[in-house]
Amino acid sequence: MENVTTMNEFLLLGLTGVQELQPFFFGIFLIIYLINLIGNGSILVMVVLEPQLHSPMYFFLGNLSCLDISYSSVTLPKLLVNLVCSRRAISFLGCITQLHFFHFLGSTEAILLAIMAFDRFVAICNPLRYTVIMNPQVCILLAAAAWLISFFYALMHSVMTAHLSFCGSQKLNHFFYDVKPLLELACSDTLLNQWLLSIVTGSISMGAFFLTLLSCFYVIGFLLFKNRSCRILHKALSTCASHFMVVCLFYGPVGFTYIRPASATSMIQDRIMAIMYSAVTPVLNPLIYTLRNKEVMMALKKIFGRKLFKDWQQHH
C-alpha cells in the first residue's frame, strides 16, 4: 500500500543540476527579466501618459504589457533565487499560489491576443464605425471579461490540484510549479485533472488562436479585394504580421506543452517550451509591436525628451 502523505513543501530541481552552469543561467535570465521590465514598463508608461495613445489599440497593448510583466514575475524571480540558493523548497500553499497566478495571467494573455486581433479587424474592415463599436465601455468590458474568465479557469486548476493526495518524492522536475509536473507526483486519481488541463486549456488557447487567425486572414482578404491603396495594404499587413508573430510565439509552445498526449510528454521539452512562453515571448512583445510603430516612437521621443534623441543622432 502506498504511503499517502500531506505534503508541506516541494523541492524544485530547477533548470540544471550542474553547478558550473548555474551562474551562466542566472546572468541570462536576469538580463531577460530586466529587459522585460524596462520594455513593457516603458510601453505602459507611454500608454498612460501620452494622450495620442489613448485609443482601443493601445489600451489593449497596455494591458498586454502589464500582463507580460506580471506573467514573468510569477516565475523568473523565484528561478533567479533558486539559481543562487542551495535550498529550493517552497510551501504547498506557495506552490498552489504560483500555479494559480501562472495560469491566471497566461490564459488572460491568450484571450487578450484574440481581442487585439478583433480590434484590428474592426479598425481595418469597418473604420467608419470603429469608434462606435470599440467605444471605451466595450474595451473595458472585453478586458474585464478576459481577466475574469481566466481567474476562474486558474481557480479551477488550483482547487483541483490542492485536493490531490501526494506520496513519495517531493522533488518537482521543473523550474516553477505547474500543473503537469505536480500531477506526476500525485498518488490519487488525476484523470479528471489531466482531462480538464487538455480540454479546457486547449479550448481557451486554440479557440483564441483560431479567432486570431481568422481575423488576420479576413483582414488580408478584405484589403486585397476591396482596397486598392498599396500604402494602406502595406500598413495593415505589417500590423497583422506583427500580431501573428506574437500569437505564434505564445500559442505554439502553450499548445505543445498542454495539448499533446501525456504519452508524448518529455520534461526537458516542457521546460524549453515553458522558457519560451514565460520568459522569451514577454521580452519580444514590446520589440515586435513598437519597432515599426511611428506613433509609439513619437510618444517615446516626447516622454523621454527630444534633446536626448538629438544628441544621440549627432553622435551617430
UniProtKB/Swiss-Prot annotation:
Provide the protein's localization.
Answer: Cell membrane
List the ranges whose topology is Extracellular.
Answer: 1-23, 74-97, 159-195, 258-270
Which cysteines are cross-linked by disulfides?
A: 95-187
Membrane topology recorded in Swiss-Prot or TrEMBL: Multi-pass membrane protein
Membrane-spanning residues: 24-44, 53-73, 98-118, 138-158, 196-215, 237-257, 271-291
Q: Which gene encodes it?
A: OR12D3
**InterPro entries cross-referenced by the UniProt entry:** GPCR_Rhodpsn, GPCR_Rhodpsn_7TM, Olfact_rcpt, Olfactory_GPCR
Q: Which Pfam families does the protein's record reference? A: 7tm_4
Query: Which GO terms of type biological process are on file?
Result: detection of chemical stimulus involved in sensory perception of smell
Cytoplasmic topological intervals: 45-52, 119-137, 216-236, 292-316
What name does UniProt use for this protein? Olfactory receptor 12D3
Q: Which GO terms describe its molecular function?
A: G protein-coupled receptor activity; odorant binding; olfactory receptor activity
Q: What does this protein do?
A: Odorant receptor.
Carbohydrate attachment sites?
A: 3
Q: Name one GO cellular component term.
A: membrane
Keyword Signal listed: no
Keywords per UniProt: Cell membrane, Disulfide bond, G-protein coupled receptor, Glycoprotein, Membrane, Olfaction, Receptor, Sensory transduction, Transducer, Transmembrane, Transmembrane helix
Protein family: Belongs to the G-protein coupled receptor 1 family.
